[in-house]
A protein has these predicted regions:
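Structural and coupling elements of P-loop NTPases
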Residues: 1-381
């Protein structure tokens, strides 16, 4: 895998109730990005992120898995977490390393306890977030009802970016609310432009008004234009969304069917376009020459520092320490100081983990997530 600069990295944790579709979404992302050449299924026990024997047996996640996908010029480090409350510590570890979150909601079940716990975790770690509603291919799913449930809980922060198109109850496409255009699926994730049907106009206008209000609030000039009845361009709306999503004042809602690859490329585009890179997140490091704490802030030009957010044990290869680089550029064979143990540790090889598969890399830039094998004294945290 190539090495990516900080501004090209997005660290995203997938959160949500157990069974909402996080692993299926991760699988679809991996497939569409070209990381895998087949689309696995949870029911078949052959997904990238659920590879443990117990996970395959249970048909659900029990630990956090890192799945890095390349989308355009960006690398998205996807952290697929378990939704079962017994494994909440896994979700907390992943949230501590992420810079943003996608809360996955079952379109069939709607907002559940796990949805609200995911939101609370985002609040705890101050994570910008989006919501992705799954199972849109099922006939009895109401996107509108899910949006209403979310709005009732979280108010005007909820802003749908897409809404479904249905014909005879079947999910056939979507409306892009930012661009105000319809899209019809012609084959899996491939689509073509189509007219917006009359029955969609009422809610399209309602959802679009929410977006326009958010855009207007980003500047006095936009507010004047909004009250003057002027339209905003797509570029202006997108720029305002990136600002508002980044500071958490707006939470976009997207939707699709990961098992059919529908809506997933839209989500990947939105992650790259609206979520911040790691440099916007504050963090600290220690300068070994002066013993002073400094603002690392995921700056590649500052001294090397990293934190271990999770430790995993492989029965064949031994222990892996999953790290997030806080500053500088960490390379194979570097010597880093362990603050807790007050000792130096020489790194061996650096890896990125594609599920259960370690891929060796020469270096990791500030903000990136990877793994180090067989560290002696290092511990999680």
């Amino acid at each position: 895998m190539d090495v990516f600069r900080t501004d090209r990295i997005r660290n995203v944790v997938l959160l949500g109730h157990s069974g909402s579709g996080k692993t299926s979404l991760t699988e679809a992302m991996a497939y569409l990005s070209g990381m895998t050449n087949r689309l696995g299924k949870v029911t078949d026990g052959n997904t990238v992120s659920d590879f443990d024997k117990e996970e395959i047996k249970r048909k659900c996640s029990i630990s956090t898995t890192l799945v890095p996908v390349v989308w355009g010029k960006n690398k998205i480090n996807v952290l697929d977490t378990p939704g079962m409350f017994d494994f909440v510590g896994e979700a907390q570890e992943a949230a501590s390393a992420a810079d943003a979150a996608v809360i996955v909601v079952s379109g069939k079940a709607g907002v559940q306890v796990g949805t609200q716990k995911a939101w609370e975790l985002c609040e705890k770690y101050n994570l910008p977030r989006m919501i992705f509603v799954t199972e849109m291919d099922q006939d009895d799913v109401s996107y509108r009802e899910v949006v209403e449930q979310l709005t009732e809980l979280y108010g005007k922060r909820i802003a749908p970016l897409h809404m479904p198109l249905r014909e005879n109850g079947k999910f056939v496409g979507y409306i892009n609310i930012v661009k105000n255009k319809g899209r019809r699926y012609i084959e899996k994730d491939k689509k073509e432009e189509c007219p917006i049907p009359d029955y969609s106009v009422e809610y399209l206008e309602k959802y679009r008004e929410t977006l326009m209000e958010s855009v207007a609030e980003t500047s006095e000039e936009f507010m004047d234009r909004y009250f003057g009845g002027e339209e905003f361009s797509v570029a202006e709306i997108s720029a305002a969304l990136a600002m508002n999503v980044g500071d958490g004042t707006i939470v976009p809602v997207c939707m699709g069917s990961p098992v059919n690859l529908q809506g997933v490329s839209n989500l990947l585009d939105d992650i790259c376009g609206y979520f911040p890179d790691p440099s916007t997140r504050p963090c600290a490091g220690i300068n070994l020459n002066t013993n002073e704490i400094f603002e690392a802030n995921y700056d590649f030009a500052k001294p090397k520092s990293a934190t271990i957010f999770k430790t995993i044990v492989d029965p064949f290869l031994g222990k892996y320490s999953m790290i997030k680089v806080c500053s500088g550029v960490i390379k194979s064979d570097d010597v880093l100081y362990n603050v807790d143990q007050e000792s130096e540790e020489k790194l061996s090889k650096l890896y990125v983990l594609e599920g259960s598969k370690p891929i060796e890399v020469p270096e990791l830039h500030a903000g990136d997530i990877g793994a180090i094998a067989k560290l002696g004294d290092a511990r999680t945290g």
